[in-house]
Swiss-Prot record:
GO CC field: cytosolic large ribosomal subunit
Residue runs in coiled coils: none
Name of the protein this chain belongs to: Large ribosomal subunit protein bL27
Keyword Ribonucleoprotein recorded: yes
Record organism: Rhodopseudomonas palustris (strain BisA53)
GO process annotations (BP): translation
Keywords, in A-Z order: Ribonucleoprotein, Ribosomal protein
Top-level taxon: Bacteria
Family designation: Belongs to the bacterial ribosomal protein bL27 family.
Record-linked HAMAP family: Ribosomal_bL27
Entries under InterPro entries matching the protein: Ribosomal_bL27, Ribosomal_bL27_CS
Positions of region (Disordered): 1-23
Length: 89
């Protein structure tokens, strides 16, 4: 006698929707205060200059400027927002 249950389809078919994580604003792109730079679980990317981190580890811009990603020697990647330098008139 078979002691394996038949592969019934009623046991299958459960899955969760994707959480839309990842980089939302790439290096060199312009941001304004409050723009989301990255959504993540944990600290894949760490906040650098002028970047804040929300309670769910979301990185966001604190000032207007351009996004910069920078890898440090310790294996961590930091995200900063560099202010826009006004042209001398």
């Amino acid at each position: 006698m078979a002691h394996k249950k038949a592969g019934g389809s009623s046991r299958n078919g459960r899955d969760s929707a994707g959480k839309r994580l990842g980089i939302k604003t790439y290096g060199g792109e312009h941001v304004i205060p409050g723009n989301i730079i990255a959504r993540q679980r944990g600290t894949t990317w760490h906040p650098g200059l002028n970047v804040g981190m929300g309670t769910d580890h979301t990185l966001f811009a604190k000032i207007e400027g351009h996004v910069q990603f920078r890898a440090k020697g310790n294996g961590r990647t930091f995200v900063s927002v560099l202010p826009i330098v006004a042209a001398a008139e």
